[in-house]
């Protein structure tokens, strides 16, 4: 590894957080520092803070993800938060959704190399796959878009009474306030700001949780989902 991409020492907390998958987490960090930088998936300046700012920051999201649910990581990029979440939670079924080919190629390589059998990589935009992918219990996202825009992509992918978990920074409260009207139209019934990672990361990771009701995405998307379901049933009968 070049000096410019020198990884920092692995924090002691990583062993506790990743457990049996600790070695895989280390390998993932190495892949980000090497192939991730070469392919332009992360900037070289991020390498010295890969553990604190990226891997651990994302892994602690697991604290607020229910057990045994389906997850779609929207705009997964280099796999953050999807891959750290997958490493600490093998009870989840995770889809990494990413539109760019060079990123999905990297994600596929990582998933295969680390043996993440509970993870699927899908190339596409959220608005393109709605109705094609099964609705999920949880949508995750990090550094994708402001909350109001992110919600228009993420919420329609949810099952009824699902939730979107967006990792945000200092702007979380401001973004949530600005997105109130948009979230309401999309079927959001409850919102909250959570702080996770006590004893693992400092500052704590900030998560905006958006819980939806019976019609995630609102009436417009409920109609689209119903049409997609009817089309799917027709195709199965013909098959």
From Swiss-Prot:
Keyword Transferase among record annotations: yes
Record bears the keyword Ribonucleoprotein: no
Enzyme Commission number(s) from the entry: 2.1.1.-
Localization per record: Cytoplasm
Gene3D superfamilies documented for this protein: Vaccinia Virus protein VP39
Highest taxon listed in the record's lineage: Bacteria
SUPFAM superfamilies: S-adenosyl-L-methionine-dependent methyltransferases (SSF53335)
UniProt note: phenotype after gene disruption: Confers low-level streptomycin resistance and a greater ability to produce the antibiotic actinorhodin.
One cellular component term from this protein's GO annotations in UniProt: cytosol
Family under the similarity heading: Belongs to the methyltransferase superfamily. RNA methyltransferase RsmG family.
Name of the molecule in the record: Ribosomal RNA small subunit methyltransferase G
Organism (species): Streptomyces coelicolor (strain ATCC BAA-471 / A3(2) / M145)
């Amino acid at each position: 590894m070049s000096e410019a991409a020198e990884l920092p020492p692995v924090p002691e907390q990583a062993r506790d957080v990743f457990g049996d998958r600790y070695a895989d987490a280390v390998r993932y960090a190495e892949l980000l520092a090497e192939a991730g930088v070469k392919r332009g998936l992360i900037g070289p300046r991020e390498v010295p803070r890969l553990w604190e700012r990226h891997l651990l920051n994302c892994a602690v999201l697991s604290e607020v993800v229910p057990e045994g649910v389906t997850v779609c990581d929207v705009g997964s990029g280099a796999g953050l938060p999807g891959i750290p979440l997958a490493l600490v939670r093998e009870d989840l079924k995770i889809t990494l959704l990413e539109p760019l080919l060079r990123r999905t190629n990297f994600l596929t390589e990582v998933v295969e190399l680390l043996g993440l059998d509970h993870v699927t990589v899908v190339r596409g935009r959220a608005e393109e796959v709605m109705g094609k992918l099964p609705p999920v219990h949880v949508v995750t996202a990090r550094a994708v878009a402001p909350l109001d825009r992110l919600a228009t992509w993420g919420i329609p992918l949810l099952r009824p009474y699902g939730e979107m978990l967006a990792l945000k920074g200092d702007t979380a409260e401001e973004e949530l306030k600005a997105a109130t009207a948009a979230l309401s139209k999309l079927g959001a019934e409850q919102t909250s700001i959570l702080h996770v990672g006590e004893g693992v990361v400092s500052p704590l990771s900030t998560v905006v949780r958006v819980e939806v009701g019976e019609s995630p995405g609102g009436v417009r998307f409920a109609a689209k989902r119903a049409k997609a379901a009817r089309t799917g049933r027709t195709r199965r009968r013909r098959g």
